[in-house]
């Protein structure tokens, strides 16, 4: 069990895979904090010390014991008015103006699963992934009951905390301060790491030693803000990326927040995170309950990298709910920097044509398509299509864009209103303003009062009327100002809940729309937003060099897959800096990847480079988004910015490096890698050079000497393992083929061979195929890798549904007759492509299948000069597959396949009984097909010919 209660000592122990959190109800009924750190099975009540300290008062219940003081004891949830003069988590005022709540223990409950918060985003998990502890504290005199909620996600090494505050009295109370989490540390010398910034330069890392007193930061802007992110790290002074103790707190909230770190009179440390108490005074009538948003806590004994990995996993697996969270996402181009407000429908279609020719998947029509909006002074609130500007209906424009073979996206800013709008003229009271005072303008716009349901309903209906006009694939939700005219103490909180309500309704109604958050870039980049949108525009600053810092700071808590990052034009529109297209591309690949430029202004050479960039990104997209992200250097301290992604099975790695400045007669620069298998051998794809993992991590790789400023490099590594032995065996088998000779009309067929690599799901087919390709290329033999995943009749989600339908209708025999047969697989198509290759055809239409309905294309591919085609596919040994010269079977068991699928982390239901049975049935067929293999790679890694 993740949560254990010792009834004799009244100690609560929360255990994750590598951490322990403990607290105790003491003899007076106070809930004291004992320990948070590396995993332990010991009761930690011995850490409490008691001393008589002057001017630190004693609860009356302590009698004559002057050593017992809430001013010095570590508390779980400290309150005002109890003799604790440090910063407190909760302040409640009654009708007489008294601010004193003394919380004593009442009860607890442990239950499976993760608690949910009504109307608020929160970490979610299945019953077997999490447990909940609910501790009830109360003050019967004050009429207040507090429910402390703890969610323990053992596998992620995170603990979540939230608080419910109930008015159990007969009168009204007012909440003046409410934090979700308090962490008291009885000893230690700490640094505080926060992520400060400004518009277009967000989340810069700042590390400050915590001296005596309070270090605090937060937001009173109505959003989490560009200025400070709602995240903090408390670290021992010697903690580095790879070693040392550090504690993280991440607030799952998109509004005003506060973080306070205090070192007290006896060198104890207190860390608090929750709602800002500025512009906050929340009335609570008798019987009402208030919910404090959630904090995600995590601890690492192995430095900041491990802490980041824990947060990345938690957010990817247990915060983001979108079906796009683990899917391949479209490479998009946004019209903003290409056209700003100056566009027509033809402009967007022309952009779509250019995009299609470059291999871009989607065009996004940004601000300016609605009302009479040709600048930023009007029409926010009037969400009807400007058909005159677009030259037709939105439906017609969407169809024209889709006809180019690309998806369509659109921009909205639903929370805002211009005074020059029909909505404002009809409902001026819907804009937030203090009665009797003129409002504060920002960007010539006001904020709609989303705390009011009628306001939300009006805008929601308008937006839906637009979205229902055609197949919209993507929406960018923007928010371009801070809140100033706070007319009531409950407004800021209720406003954010209104935004969440709107977003929940939107994603529920349109689950197939990819939603991207934005607030002038990264002004609302937080876990609360990621609950609704799997990605957020990281910053309005697209300068590649500035972005290395912005994305570096963002990566401490948020995964790469959440960071909107694009290649933009040069000179950069924000900084005026000129960087190469290569540098801009490599930097943008550390995010969702897309473009913010006008392709019509590009040279033919630049367009070709973009095509290659997109191919490169798509090749590594799943590695980047699903792999483990490592920071290799700090762009704040080092001469290069370097980072890498490593597959979860540690068989592939992509390293990216950007030089931040050039220096005459510069010293050699080396970058040490991380996260590899020490004893494994890796080959670098571009050079063919081989290294051990230990060498790459301990000695590093030398960078080329800089020729000019801001150069960038990428290095791709593949673990060899059995691939080299397999290659040698393949060369023996096909040794009589003259693969290095040019084709002639008579020899083309004889000189081309097809190799299939087949085995259980997750058995390493992709990695081995990539390594084999590299070996062939090193021997000057052109080679192409074809994935069989493109050849089912249905996209993956629909195929999974069909498998289940077949099983429900026809049982296991029916399922066995479906899996890997022409009922499931388009063998006619793949056999046609293989036949055309074998007979010497140079231009072949290759099928490509995405993960969305209708996402199927047939792309002309040039096979001129290619001698070897490697097909990596579970069904590469099927009796229905024709034209394979050398079938290679990778032995595995269902248990191994299941373990690899879970480790890979790509399949949500990898451990479900049905999927496990599918794997077993597939393995039965594979074992039979293995007998027909020319070469077998055994479970022990040995390679032999049959």
Model-derived regions, located:
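Small-molecule kinase domains that catalyze NTP-dependent phosphoryl transfer to phosphate-bearing small molecules
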Residues: 906-946
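C-terminal beta-strand-rich structural cap/linker in extracellular carbohydrate-active enzymes
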Residues: 693-722
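Aromatic-lined carbohydrate-binding/catalytic grooves of carbohydrate-active enzymes
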Residues: 324-461, 474
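Active-site neighborhood of glycoside hydrolase catalytic domains
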Residues: 389-393, 425-582, 592-597, 601
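ATP-dependent NMP and nucleoside kinases share a basic, alpha-helical "lid"
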Residues: 856-904
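Carbohydrate-binding surface patches
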Residues: 241, 634-677
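Conserved nucleotide-sensing/catalytic segment adjacent to the nucleotide-binding pocket
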Residues: 784, 793-852
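Polysaccharide-binding surfaces and accessory modules of carbohydrate-active proteins
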Residues: 5, 10-13, 17, 21, ...
